[in-house]
Amino acid sequence: MTQAPLTAVISARRPLAPEAMNLFLETAPGPVRWYVDYGEAADYRAAGAVEVIEVGGLVQARNAALADAFAEGRACVQVSDDLRRLRRHSAIGGGAAGLGEVIEAMSVACAETGATLAGLPPTDNEFYTPADPRYRHGVFIVGDLIFVRPSPQRFDRQLRLKEDYDFTVQHDQAAGAVRVQTYLASFAHRDNRGGAVSYRTMEAEAEAIGYLMHKWPGRFRLNGRRPGEILMRRPARRRAA
């Protein structure tokens, strides 16, 4: 792929986010666009976002970014608006990493494995994220920072939460999804107002979990240690005939 990827910042109800995010976005290798809720573009531009598109909610924003990137012959990078730190795993020397460096690592992972979706570990704690092997397959790809090659998969519009679990399985059961273990990211997440936090409740979590377990039998199980959370299972191996 010759075109540099589109970097899409997925945001809503956080109009000051560009002030911090622009420091990371400086190293993005291609165009950068903010995808926000209706009526928010002016506030985001006032805070430093240059290109802003109003598309509605979370899943609508994610799918609009995919459509725009693929129509331009680009891969799509999606990043949440509350990124706080990117760093290299100590196994490859440690230290701060730029967004462009991480995007390149995810792009290479897709090229080397044939996967159409790449991402990073869901935690920046190295105790839970060994760097060997460098790539992991059949595991959850958290949607906070992903690289998506042109492909037919889209985020499920029935989901307002946990849409990245569904998206991971879609890719995993097609060309593949790969997690790059050598880079780590941290996000403000649930301590940050706005975004999905504004409607994340235990009832909404339970509804999303039920939907996912019905749609993908055998691919998820409840997390016994964390109510309202699920764990992704590897696909069952087929028995030889």
Per-region residue spans from a language model:
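Active-site-proximal specificity loops/subdomain of glycosyltransferases
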Residues: 35-79, 84-99
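Short coil/turn segments at beta-strand junctions that form active-site/ligand-binding loops
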Residues: 4, 30, 72-75, 176
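Short, solvent-exposed loop/turn segments at secondary-structure junctions
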Residues: 14-15, 41, 82-84, 123-126, ...
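Conserved catalytic core of nucleotide-sugar-dependent glycosyltransferases
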Residues: 86-169, 241
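A structural signal for short, well-ordered beta-strand segments and their strand-loop junctions
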Residues: 34, 76-79, 116-121, 178-182, ...
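Short, well-formed alpha-helical segments that are part of the catalytic scaffolds
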Residues: 6-30, 38-46
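C-terminal catalytic/acceptor-binding lobe
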Residues: 2-6, 13-16, 159-161, 165-241
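Short beta->alpha connector loops
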Residues: 12-16, 56-59, 150-153
